[in-house]
A protein has these predicted regions:
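Gram-negative outer-membrane beta-barrel domains
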Residues: 12-208
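Gram-negative bacterial Sec-dependent N-terminal signal peptides
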Residues: 1-14
Length: 208
């Protein structure tokens, strides 16, 4: 139904091709992290946690091509931050916190022009997220991953367009190990996690 409604707004002739663009969007996001915890007694616990959120983003890019095929090259920023806090199982109960902020993505998306005003695309992206680790564990400064997605771009007038997209980002495995400092987290404690993000996004863009 969304597809049909958006198609009704289009009235330009392949106007989104061969243009630099700027866009802003909002996403419904679901985050899942599978991992395990190896405590000071060498007991291993496995599990998964999940959370949902609504985020905003903005980006710049360039669409090029003509006829049936095209290509979209872009860079997107998702500002904001989130903090995770954990308490060690050691006798000290030392707190460890992890702050995630400012996700960026570079992407390439081959496009198939279905009509004069609408394109379908497949996207592959390279993601990086800043991390700030506080506590007696090894410090990891970034979290990297890759995105695969499918979406549509619908021309709306002569300069505007609407983008809809669904996809997932799989991040590299994170491993945190205690440093064993005084009143800190023992070196025998270790946590690993592999975060995955699933999302749906709608954006409005302007073509220069």
């Amino acid at each position: 139904f969304t597809f049909v409604a958006i198609m009704g707004l289009t009235n330009a002739s392949n106007a989104f091709m061969e243009n630099v663009y700027f866009e802003v969007g909002t996403s419904a996001v679901g985050v899942e992290a599978d991992g395990n915890h190896n405590d000071a007694q060498s007991q291993v616990t496995t599990g998964a946690v999940g959370k949902t959120a609504v985020t905003g983003s903005y980006g710049l890019g360039y669409m090029l091509g003509s006829g049936t095929l095209g290509l979209d090259l872009g860079y997107m920023v998702t500002p904001g931050e989130a903090k995770i806090r954990s308490t060690s199982d050691s006798a000290s109960g030392k707190d460890v916190s992890l702050e995630i902020s400012d996700m960026t993505e570079m992407y390439v998306a081959p496009m198939l022009n279905m009509t004069d005003d609408a394109s379908l695309y497949l996207k592959y992206g390279w993601n990086s997220t800043d991390l700030t680790t506080v506590g007696d564990v090894n410090k990891i400064n970034s979290m990297d991953g890759n995105t695969v997605a499918i979406g549509t771009v619908m021309s709306w007038g002569s300069n505007l367009y609407i983008r809809t997209e669904v996809g997932m980002t799989e991040y590299d495995k994170l491993t945190f190990t205690g440093l064993g400092n005084t009143n800190g987290v023992p070196t025998t404690e270790k946590v690993t996690a592999t975060p995955d993000v699933h999302y749906g996004r709608i954006s409005i863009g302007y073509k220069f």
